[in-house]
Amino acid sequence: MSWTVPLVRASQRVSSVGANFLCLKMALCPRQAARIPLKGAWRFTSVSKMATVKSELIERFTSEEPVHHSKVSIIGTGSVGMACAISILLKGLIDELALVDLDEGKLKGETMDLQHGSSFTKMPNIVCSKDYFVTANSNLVIITAGARQEKGETRLNLVQRNVALFKLMISNIVQHSPHCKLIIVSNPVDILSYVAWKLSAFPKNRVIGSGCNLDTARFRFLIGQKLGIHSESCHGWILGEHGDSSVPVWSGVNIAGVPLKDLNSDIGTDKDPEQWKNVHEEVIATAYEIIKMKGYTSWAIGLSVADLTESILKNLRRTHPVSTIIKGLYGIDEEVFLSIPCILGENGITHLIKIKLTPEEEDRLKKSAKTLWEIQKELKI
C-alpha cells in the first residue's frame, strides 16, 4: 500500500498585530498527522493552495519604491492613550500607528479592536508590541503612560516615580526614533516635559508638552456657552501651568476682534458684577468633576492631542498654547516648561508668540514658574 504524503504548514496567531509565525512545517503521514493536537488557535493550511491563490489573483506590475511615510507611536494604551489613537486615526493623518504598553493583554486587545475598524479609518497599518522596536522611525511619539498618584503620596514622590519610568521610555524612544518629535501628555505634564527634554537631549523645539491646549479649549467653550456663540469664534488663552495655577489672559479675550475688557473693565476680577472669573474656576474644576463622575478624562484630551498632531504632521504653523521652555521670558529665570502660544509645524515648535500680559497676569505666570521649580530642583534625573 502506498501513501500520498501531504505537505502542511501549522501556524498560530500569536500577536494582535496579525502576524502569523510558522511553528511546524513538515511532511507527515496520516497516522502522524492524526496525533497532532488541533485545539486552540492552531490552523493547518495547504501551502501550495495559498501560493496558487495568490499567484492566480495577483501579478507584480512594477517594483515598489519607498515613499514618504508618516508614523506616530503612542506609549500607553490607557483611556487617554486610546482616545489619542482613535482621534488621530479619524483625522486620517498617518500611514502607520504603533502602540506600546507593558500590559500585553490590554495592548493586544486594544490593537485588535482598532484593526477590526481599519476599513472605516482607511488606515490598516496598526502595530503593537511591548518592545520599543515597533516605534522605529516614528515622526512623532506621544507619551501618555505614567505612574498614578497613590493615597497620601506627595507630588514630589509621584514625579520622582515618573522620572524612573521616563528614563526607560525616553532611552528606548531615542534609540529607535532619534529624529522624532515628542508630545508629553502624562501628568504633571509641565514637569514631565522638562524631564523628557533633559533625558532625551533633544533640541527644545522637539519636546512639546500638551500643556494648556485643552485648558484653552475649555475656556473658549465656557465663554461661548455664556455668550451663546460657538467656541471657535471665542478667542482667549489659558497660559502657564496645566492645572490649578493656570493663568487666564482676560486682557486678550475677544469676539470678532472686540475685546471683552473694553465692554467690562473689571472682567475676570473680584469686582466684576458678572463674575466672569467663575469661567476660569470652572476650567480648573471641570476635570475633577469629570473624574468624579466617570473615573478619568479621555475624549477631550485625545482630541486636543490629535489637534497638535495635525499641526505638526501637516506643517500647518498654527498657534497653540503648549508647554515649552520659558526661561528668559516674562522675567522668569527658572528653567521650567510652561504653556505660552507657540507656532507648531513639521519641526515642532518653530516660534513663540510674545503675547502681551498685564502686570497681574505676568505675576501669576512667575508664581506658576516658581511653584514648578520648587519641585524640579529636587528631582534626581
From Swiss-Prot:
Keyword Oxidoreductase in annotation: yes
Positions that bind NAD(+): D101, L102, D103, E104, G105, K106, R148, N187
Recorded GO MF terms: L-lactate dehydrogenase activity
InterPro entries: L-lactate/malate_DH, L-lactate_DH, L-lactate_DH_AS, Lactate/malate_DH_C, Lactate/malate_DH_N, Lactate_DH/Glyco_Ohase_4_C, NAD(P)-bd_dom_sf
GO BP: any one term: lactate metabolic process
UniProt cross-references to Gene3D superfamilies, sorted A to Z: Lactate dehydrogenase/glycoside hydrolase, family 4, C-terminal, NAD(P)-binding Rossmann-like Domain
E.C. designation(s): 1.1.1.27
Positions with a binding annotation for substrate: R155, N187, R218, T297
UniProt catalytic activity: (S)-lactate + NAD(+) = pyruvate + NADH + H(+)
Pathway(s): Fermentation; pyruvate fermentation to lactate; (S)-lactate from pyruvate: step 1/1
Coiled coil: none
A single Gene Ontology CC term: cytoplasm
Cross-referenced CDD domains: LDH_1
Active site: H242 (proton acceptor)
PANTHER family reported in the protein's UniProt record: L-2-HYDROXYCARBOXYLATE DEHYDROGENASE (NAD(P)(+)), L-LACTATE DEHYDROGENASE A-LIKE 6B
HAMAP family: Lactate_dehydrog (MF_00488)
Family according to the record: Belongs to the LDH/MDH superfamily. LDH family.
Name under which the protein is recorded: L-lactate dehydrogenase A-like 6B
Organism of this sequence: Macaca fascicularis
